[in-house]
Amino acid sequence: MTKKISHPETIALHGGDYRSDPATTAVAVPVYRTTSYQFKDTDNAANLFALKEFGNIYTRIMNPTNDVLEKRVAALEGGLACVTVGSGQAASTFAILNVCKSGDNFISSTDLYGGTVNLFTHTSKKMGIECRYADPTDPKNFEKLIDENTRAFYAETLPNPYLRVFPIKEVADIGRKHNIPLIMDNTAAPVICKPLEHGAAVVVHSLTKFIGGHGTVIGGCLVDGGNFDWTADPKRHPNFNEPDASYGGAVWGEVVPQLTGANVAFAVRARVCLLRDLGAPLAPDNAWGIIQGLETAPLRMKQHCANAEKAVDFLKKHKNVERVIYPTLHEGEIANRSKKYLKGGNGALVGIEVKGGVEAGKKFIEALKMFYHVANIGDARSLAIHPATTTHSQLTPEELLAAGVTPGYVRLSIGIEHPDDIIADLDQALNASGKSSLKAVG
């Protein structure tokens, strides 16, 4: 294709440079189940290992199937390069380890996925990397926590349970003033939000969720926006400005642009250092499965979002719903962020507070017939979970409230079924939860 494509529906099918398999002319992307690759000669092998030229060495680091997925996701996000990894959690881990070392710190939004909170609060701390938390309701809270060892900002575009859209540009601008990159987890908002367009430097995804979209494979990725100057402040980013002894003294901020002609030092370092040393590659079979999901992701996101809007309209009026949480239902500046950053929909995640507390929430979950009760989001199917008795069950009542998890709170991931069927299942389950609450009171 000679014309640059910009529409996500087309990028999902044609993004990158894959047109057909060079060996067989197959149109569908093949699964390359191989660990290693034949070198052309000894000079070629030496050059590949010395990073004097790029090519396949070992599937822990790169694979032709993964390469197609990486280029398409990079194109979808508007980035220059992408590195796939074994899970979304691995993507978050690599994003931090790529910029931080022991003694460094980074600043994260308080609105985070629980697994990421554990990673940042406990595991990163054991590595000597400090996470400082900033309330995202005021972007200036990030600036207040900066010191000379701060290496990055981190946030989620559309975090639950609050579903408050993050102020991407405002925080990115603060970061760039101090030469600090903003890393955005865009898992819950692919297609409908482009963080790189608003100043983020890196985007991470759990490809397991909406991009994969079918609850069949686990995967993650890091997208390098190519819009951050890692060499502007060498003291701020030593990982990119000091010689790397493991690669013959290579200085990543200098050698990568020289080698590739592109500002993709973040992606290259993540691939050749972190995948090399820590593993966590995405299996080619899983990459192939995610490619199948990616091809229809823009279409599914439209249906996810449209169905969620209809479900929200219904839930707001139901007598057994205390409160509905959705990006468009916030007030003031937080509501304005939805209009500013989300285009083509407001996401598939919906939070509800079921009247009657914990018991009513449990009864609602147990009464659902079409929704699946699982700890996942972003499936084509509709999903539900009651965090107070599952994902957050180890927390005290005070900790639950601080996390935004109230006794009757239920998280819904609205699928692509017919909206009438989604609403019918919610209705009968809510009616059942109300009966349960009345019996408990009586």
Regions found by a protein language model. Name each.
Residues 1-56, 438-442:
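N-terminal glycine-rich, Lys/His-bearing helix-loop that initiates the first secondary-structure elements
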Residues 80, 121-122, 148-151, 300, ...:
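PLP-dependent enzyme catalytic core of the Aspartate aminotransferase-like
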Residues 301, 309, 313-316, 320-410, ...:
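Conserved C-terminal alpha-helix-loop-beta "cap" of PLP-dependent enzymes
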Residues 54, 80, 286, 290, ...:
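Short amphipathic alpha-helical segments
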Residues 2-3, 14-20, 81-320:
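Conserved PLP-enzyme active-site core in the AAT-like
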Residues 36, 225-228, 354-357:
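Short loop segments at secondary-structure junctions
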Residues 158, 187-189, 329, 355, ...:
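Active-site beta-loop-alpha junctions enriched in small/polar residues
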Residues 36, 41-93, 115-123:
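Conserved N-terminal alpha-helix of the aminotransferase class I/II PLP-enzyme fold
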